[in-house]
Amino acid sequence: MQLSIIIPVYGSPESIKELCERVSTSLRGLVDSFEIILVDDECPDDSWSEIKKTTQTLPNVIGLKLSRNFGQHKAICAGLHESKGDYCVVMDCDLQDLPEDIPTLYEKAKEGNDVVLGQRIERQDKKFKVLKSKVFYYFFNLLSGLNSDPTVANFSIISRKVVTAYLSFKEQDIDYTNVINWLGFDAVKIPVRHAERKYGESSYNYWKLME
């Protein structure tokens, strides 16, 4: 069984090496093989140089560099296109998603679940950011007719069947979690830990979700 870890990168260059080392440690002995795909979304910092250094020291790491800043969800799509795993994990680069929780997601997927979503029961973001998230998703769900959960972000595992369906989806201006929701595969949610941001500040905002 092969596992692909898709990580869109924008900011947090300090976290890249530690993140990949912790992912590698968490996956040793869990699967036959794995790959970590870091997608540089044209970061205006040292992220690409850190990605290149990491690919030279960790053989399972692959670096992709986009030609311009396309946004987080298109970076995820680029990583999925490159992936070869029977299952793909999507996670953020800032170490708020804990690599040590990947085995829990994987074991749940092996029970026959095509989509397993990490549910952040105790978010470690600032209270104002959590409030903005709740307000955004309230109105987003009201207008879209979807049922998006503000406690669920990118941290998830999906089967190859779901990856294929995701990549055939032609709409480019909708985010990863809502595409997964729209595709209609049975999904289960499991609690995952959520760490405080260790390096830098988030560049993500809810206006980007509306683009």
Language model regions located:
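Cell-envelope/extracellular polymer assembly enzymes that use nucleotide-activated donors
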Residues: Q2-S4, E35
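Short helix-capping segments at alpha-helix termini
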Residues: L27-D32, T55-N60
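Acidic helix N-cap motif at the loop->helix transition within catalytic regions
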Residues: S15-K17, D45-T54
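A conserved acidic beta->alpha catalytic loop
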Residues: D40-S49, L95-Q96
